[in-house]
Amino acid sequence: MATFEEVSVLGFEEFDKAVKEHEGKTIFAYFSGSKDTEGKSWCPDCVEAEPVIREGLKHVTEDCVFIYCQVGDKPYWKDPNNDFRQKLKITAVPTLLKYGTPQKLVESECCQSSLVEMIFSED
């Protein structure tokens, strides 16, 4: 059975560092609105998608790294010049992607278990 290592990061710089530390491995990245002190994201779609993503991780077919990235607070996220939008071309949260490939699920797609399972299980 395939396994994954989970890395939780906050912000673009930590995300970039985590990607570099795991170079050469298959990386899945999940981008979510940051959580408050009670562990709840400001992004309702992210709250809805997280359990679907967690369930989907059970379907990974290769050893990989799962980076859970909190993108920051809502005002930062809405800034069109933030690094996630500029450097990674991420336009919405939640977003799940297979790093370095065109495979990406955005917003409501992250709540569809069949799509989530597919992204984790495709070669």
Curated annotation (Swiss-Prot):
The cross-references to Pfam families, in alphabetical order and at most eight, read: TXD17-like_Trx
Q: Which SUPFAM superfamilies match?
A: Thioredoxin-like
| Catalytic residues (UniProt) | 43, 46
Q: Name one GO molecular function term.
A: peroxidase activity
The UniProt site entry described as Contributes to redox potential value is assigned to: 44-45
Q: Name one GO biological process term.
A: tumor necrosis factor-mediated signaling pathway
Q: Which UniProt keywords apply?
A: Acetylation, Cytoplasm, Disulfide bond, Redox-active center
This protein's GO CC annotations: cytosol
Q: How is this chain modified after translation?
A: The oxidized protein is reduced by TRXR1.
What quaternary arrangement does the UniProt entry report?
Interacts with TRXR1 and DYNLL1/DNCL1.
Q: What does this protein do?
A: Disulfide reductase. May participate in various redox reactions through the reversible oxidation of its active center dithiol to a disulfide and catalyze dithiol-disulfide exchange reactions. Modulates TNF-alpha signaling and NF-kappa-B activation. Has peroxidase activity and may contribute to the elimination of cellular hydrogen peroxide.
Q: Which family does it belong to?
A: Belongs to the thioredoxin family.
* Record protein name field: Thioredoxin domain-containing protein 17
Native source organism of the sequence: Mus musculus (Mouse)
The organism's taxonomic lineage, starting at the top: Eukaryota, Metazoa, Chordata, Craniata, Vertebrata
